[in-house]
């Protein structure tokens, strides 16, 4: 099924060129079914790239989805034109009285900072608090997952000895979990981070299930039993060349990074990387939309206001 977007969003041209089924506002308004309402809190600096990555995956799901984008007004974006932000993004004050079936909180390149030192931290915590009564299921990605665990459950992050960057094997620990429907026993996906959370903290401070993990990546996917909280520390959404661009960016600023693991053929950065996680990515996002959101969300989203007591937040 298609994804519905603003007719003028630049990502539309890219997605249509890839034969992704997109429904514009005019066509969508003639359909008499309730689409899923999804809000994307995009914390990444390259916002248009992240938009396209996430929309590509959402468009592969079997449901019509209305997507809105949220940004943190307390942070000034340096890598995206103001006109783009004003046209396609909303502030928290503009959406705080609305309700959504799903919320996606992206990663952000701030993971080596204490959470409280991130300039939009207070605004982000307002979004987390608001989501209890206004969102059915929240999917937290990478730093967004760490931020959610820290604020909602008191689980802190810890520095790794070196950056984890590459394509890594992970094992499905809960094949009975709906998020893993259609997965093989193991899968690969990109990871790119300097920090991690520990299994001990997850067991001691939360009631979350470990859905997937890996020998090299540690925890990979966590979820509450009702799937209203989902945490993914990897980057299913990454393009074929995203890790390559990150690697070259780090080289240019003198970080001297290791070559991303299991990524370039023969570990040769001059070679084009192999895309090996596309099926897992599409399956994961389809499962989240279908099982965590569509199958359980109320038809009248306002009902979320009356039933949020089972959230395990602090």
UniProtKB/Swiss-Prot annotation:
It is found in: Cytoplasm. CDD domains: GATase1_HTS. Keywords: Acyltransferase, Amino-acid biosynthesis, Cytoplasm, Methionine biosynthesis, Transferase. The keyword Acyltransferase applies. The keyword RNA-binding does not apply. The record marks 192 as: Important for substrate specificity. It comes from the Bacteria. Signal peptide: none annotated. GO terms for molecular function: homoserine O-acetyltransferase activity; homoserine O-succinyltransferase activity. Its EC number is 2.3.1.31. InterPro entries: Class_I_gatase-like, HST_MetA, MetA_family. Substrate binds at residues 163, 192, 249. The active site is at residues 142, 235, 237. Its main location: cytoplasm. HAMAP family: MetA_acyltransf (MF_00295). Transfers an acetyl group from acetyl-CoA to L-homoserine, forming acetyl-L-homoserine. This is Homoserine O-acetyltransferase. It comes from Streptococcus thermophilus (strain CNRZ 1066).
